[in-house]
Design a protein with these regions (language model features):
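Glycine-rich, basic loop-to-helix element that forms the pyrophosphate-binding segment
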Residues: 68-84
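Short aromatic/hydrophobic "clamp" motif used to bind/position activated sugar donors
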Residues: 89
């Protein structure tokens, strides 16, 4: 490896955002020599590839574009990790960007660091760049810790804050699930059983965009992507099941299980409440429910206690399990009318 840091940018139909993203990575010449920017074009149908290739002749020692067939988010991470030349590796989504000044300071400090995982701050912004919220860590900065101390602290690590040592990921044979979105959860949790050392550098590097229409976190997209969460959760359960007894004793395992429970409740709610009553995925939710009953009985039990609202304590998952039908709020309205008006 002859680079200090590799930035992997999974890219699919991002022509409207890619210039902003890539321009934010333009650093002073000396730092550019230490940086590898790898744009993994995931079969984009717009001008994303053309835009990305514009940077190669201008910065041939830094920018590199990989054009490949569509395989979704995880396939881009896997390809980037396979070919990364940096001692460290970080993910940047193509519709997000870095604060260039903070990134430059981070690169300067990174030269003097030797750790399996580095944490930095990030900010959540809207598509116009307006600040929504800031995220930092209540951890002593600029001090190398044994990662076990972080695990025991209960701190949650966001994908946007994490940089990993590339060799560590390769040694644990890290591989992200392909063919689906939302696998950034894997990037946060899976490598942690291989991390021995960690340091927190309080630079506000990452700008994470929330609210852009069409992004994977858009509510309309989420409603159509429940099958991705189904596959992700099955992969997470399989990963957790195969951890060693020693790894299962660590706080990381508890966080994985908590995330499995949290995301599972989202699948139930999406299928049984949010999706259109006439078009929800009946086969998927039945298979998912059976899977959770067998693999995670406690999650299955907790799902049965889910209610629509605090003021409407209807256990909609339990109702569906008993009747095979989704609970309809219309039923409450009709019952009220019959009682109140005799209709």
């Amino acid at each position: 490896m002859n680079k200090l840091l590799t930035i992997v940018i999974p890219t699919y139909n991002m022509q409207d955002y890619l210039h902003r993203c890539l321009d934010s990575l333009l650093l002073p010449d000396k730092q550019m020599e230490q940086l590898e920017v790898m744009v993994v074009n995931d079969g984009s149908k717009d001008n994303s590839s053309i835009i990305a290739h514009e940077y190669e002749p201008k910065h041939p020692k830094t920018f590199r574009v990989i054009d490949k067939e569509n395989g979704n988010y995880g396939s881009c991470i896997n390809r980037g990790l396979k070919e990364a030349a940096g001692k460290y590796i970080k993910i940047l989504d193509a519709d997000d960007w870095f604060d260039t000044a903070e990134f430059s300071r981070y690169m300067e400090e990174l030269q003097h660091i030797d750790a399996d995982m580095i944490l930095t701050n990030h900010q959540v912004v809207d598509d116009a760049g307006n600040l929504t919220s800031k995220y930092s860590y209540n951890i002593e900065p600029n001090k190398l810790f044994a990662f076990q101390e972080y695990k025991e602290s209960g701190v949650y690590f966001a994908m946007h804050s994490i940089t990993y040592r590339t060799q560590m990921l390769r040694e644990i044979k890290y591989r992200q699930t392909e063919g689906i979105s939302y696998t950034d959860t894997e990037w946060v949790f899976y490598p942690q059983h291989g991390v021995q050392s960690c340091i927190y550098l309080p630079f506000d590097v990452y700008r994470y965009v929330i609210g852009r229409e069409g992004q994977t976190m858009d509510a309309k997209v989420l409603l159509k992507s429940v099958s991705h969460y189904d596959k992700l959760l099955r992969a997470m359960v399989d990963f957790a099941n195969h951890l060693s007894t020693e790894d299962k004793a660590l706080y990381t395992y508890q966080r994985i299980e908590a995330q499995i429970a949290h995301l599972s409740m989202g699948v139930y709610r999406t299928c049984l409440v949010l999706q259109d009553a006439d078009n929800y995925d009946k086969e998927l939710i039945k298979a998912f429910d059976d899977f959770m009953k067998n693999e995670r009985p406690q999650v299955y039990k907790e799902a049965g206690q889910l209610t629509l609202k605090k003021y409407l304590p209807i256990h909609y998952v339990r109702y569906w399990r008993i009747t095979g039908k989704r609970f309809s709020v219309d039923w409450i309205r009709d019952t009220y009318r019959r009682i109140r008006y005799g209709k």
